[in-house]
Amino acid sequence: MQAADGKKYLTDVANTEQLFRLIQSVPSPKAEPFKLWIAQVAKERLDQMQDPELSIEQAMADYKRLGYSDNWINQRLKSIEIRKDLTDEWKKRGLEEGLHFATLTDIIYKSWSDMTSKEYKRFKGLRKENLRDNMTNKELVLNMLAELSTKEISEASEPDTFSEHINVAQQGGEVARSPIRAGSQNREKRYLTAQRPKDN
């Protein structure tokens, strides 16, 4: 691996999972606090699998800890529910996660915001961060409207081919585009902003 001085050195690297496994295998008492923490996190995850409401409570606590407002957190949780309803509809129609979902999501974004998810992330100065976690309340509402509309149009029209799904996604995004078009050009710029919810 190339170091800051430009020279290459043999370097041990690990991903997160490998690092946790390595910590578990260390016999030193100094590793014990990490092992206990890993066990605690695993227990919490198992509890959440038994009682999904705990996952929601954990998500709320995590967003709060990251500095999001209660109002934004409520909007975000609602957007997660609407997104899941849409992806459930796509699965029911035989679409697969991955390329299908990503393509249709890009079409929805492009139809209401004039940006694909990649362009939207660039607009907000994001790299690996989740785009929806960095949308303002207005942007979340518009995206929820687009995704909810897409789901309802899909249920009504029962698309069979992927090209039909593309058409449905465009129609759903257009529904959310209407409030933006109804306003002036200045209002449109206020709907879409490089600002992030934690910037307020």
Q: Model-predicted segments: where are they?
A:
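Positively charged, phosphate-engaging catalytic surfaces used for nucleic-acid and nucleotide handling
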Residues: A4, K8, A14-Q18, Q24-N200
